[in-house]
């Protein structure tokens, strides 16, 4: 009877242990959803609760806890908070021990460590060293991981920050060539990457370089897409800032042609009517603007 009671108690303990671990996993899942909505404070709270449960259940050195710490560090980094480095490094060390150096999860944590020095600490030389190591490890993995583009471009970001534009340009052109070969020269995947690279240069103060990548992306996106309209606006504005009159005129004509085509489409939804009212107001046609506002 005593043996039976001890066995029952052991089973109950194991069940409670399992439930606690499962609760931690659920908290991490909830936190990821919150992170996707950019609700970082609530996500951080849930991740810290999950971390406490992992430690409580003996999962101090586990893949699950490493994932929790990785996401926790990322949430702090998205808020540009220094705590992000501590959690990211803990995740990286844990993943390196459990999974090995050439595991993509370890490399992702190493990448985030580099991002801390690049975007928060602004220690560009150190960021370049870490992102160089990230890329070196990533390049060993075959077949090429889907994260490879991002890891390599992050190294280019370091070179741009350091003013080493030739090195950055070499990486960018290499990645574009790879993407064109993988997805096709006129694929939307390539267009999105070109747009991303354009933003990278633009935000780094190199508008003259960024706009050339925006133009390449613009020439791929369909003219009825939101990206096309967005890039048309961005490119026009940049050439105005750069005082490049021939390009300003070129994109003004493209904008006029695009607007004319859009006006030929049916429009009876409030959002569409409001947008058209704003357009007519911008060109000084107040009668049509008023009519569309009233109809909306």
What are these regions (language model features)?
Residues 1-23:
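Bacterial Sec-dependent N-terminal signal peptides
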Residues 16-48, 52, 56, 60-70:
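N-terminal leader/linker segments that initiate helical-solenoid repeat arrays
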Residues 25-36, 63-78, 88, 104-119, ...:
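Conserved alpha-helical positions within TPR/SEL1-like repeat arrays
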Residues 40, 81-82, 124, 165, ...:
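TPR-repeat structural position
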Residues 56-60, 97-101, 140-143, 181-185, ...:
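Short coil/turn linkers that connect adjacent helices within long alpha-helical scaffolds
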Residues 199-202, 218-296:
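Eukaryotic tandem repeat interaction scaffolds
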């Amino acid at each position: 009877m005593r043996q039976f009671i001890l066995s029952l108690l052991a089973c109950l303990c194991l069940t409670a242990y399992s439930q606690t671990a499962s609760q931690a996993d659920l908290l991490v899942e909830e936190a990821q959803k919150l992170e996707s909505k950019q609700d970082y404070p609530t996500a951080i709270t849930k991740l810290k609760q999950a971390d406490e449960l992992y430690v409580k259940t003996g999962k101090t050195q586990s893949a699950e806890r490493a994932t929790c710490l990785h996401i926790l560090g990322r949430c702090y980094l998205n808020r540009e908070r220094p705590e992000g480095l501590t959690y990211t490094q803990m995740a990286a060390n844990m993943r390196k021990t459990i999974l090995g150096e050439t595991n993509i999860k370890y490399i992702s944590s190493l990448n985030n460590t580099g991002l801390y020095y690049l975007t928060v600490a602004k220690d560009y030389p150190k960021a370049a060293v870490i992102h160089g190591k990230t890329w070196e490890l990533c390049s060993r993995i075959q077949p090429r991981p889907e994260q490879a583009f991002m890891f390599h471009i992050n190294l280019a970001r370091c070179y741009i920050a350091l003013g080493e534009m030739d090195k950055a340009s070499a990486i960018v052109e290499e990645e574009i060539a790879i993407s064109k070969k993988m997805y096709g020269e006129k694929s939307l995947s390539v267009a999105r990457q070109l747009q991303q690279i354009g933003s990278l240069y633009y935000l780094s103060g190199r508008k003259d370089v960024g706009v050339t990548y925006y133009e390449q992306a613009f020439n791929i996106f369909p003219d009825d897409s939101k990206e096309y309209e967005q890039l048309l606006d961005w490119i026009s504005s940049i050439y105005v800032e750069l005082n490049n009159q021939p390009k300003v005129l070129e994109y003004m004509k493209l904008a006029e042609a695009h607007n004319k085509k859009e006006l030929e489409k049916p429009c009876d939804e409030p959002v569409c009517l409001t947008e058209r009212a704003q357009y007519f107001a911008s060109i000084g046609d107040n009668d049509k603007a008023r009519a569309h506002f009233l109809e909306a």
